[in-house]
Amino acid sequence: MVPGQTLEIKDGIVYLDGKANKQPDNVQTNYVVELLQPISAELRKEIRLSQEDLPEQMNRPGTHIFPLTPMAAELLASNKAVAQSVEKYDYPYYEWLYPMNLHTGWTVDNYGPIWIPAKGETVQLTLETLPFYERLIKVYENNDLSVKNGAIYINGEKAESYTFKMDYYWMMGDNRQNSADSRFWGPVPED
């Protein structure tokens, strides 16, 4: 995602500036799979389930969470001799999602909206918006930022807005529910 866009994720679908983004064909999400028997090596290859995706107890029937493409999930679900059920895993709220200093109620599948800063663009700063941009302003753009008596100060001056010096990018992996990406560490500076 590029600077100046607003990102939102709804039910695992990425929206940029309010428009749904086409999912990559190989995007994986986690599915809860109730196995009746172990998945054969041949079927694992067909659904592209790697050895590292397999839990240790894979050699016996039971309920497991696997990263699968929608096509692989359909194929596994259609094999009633192997899988009793295949359902998309609904991730709970994560406290460690960006911004970590704000309780948003967001999940990896339902996130945002968040504006991705662009060089020369200005954002209005309030105590509500500050958690989204504080790290960028302080760490990446080397400013002294503080809050005193409910007011925001940048480099000793009271600030109600901030103009970014750099472009920022939003990184997301194809294995959406198993990716350490910008949902966890925020926008990435151009440098």
Show which residues each predicted segment covers.
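Extended hydrophobic leader/signal-anchor segments used for secretion and membrane insertion
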Residues: V2-D191
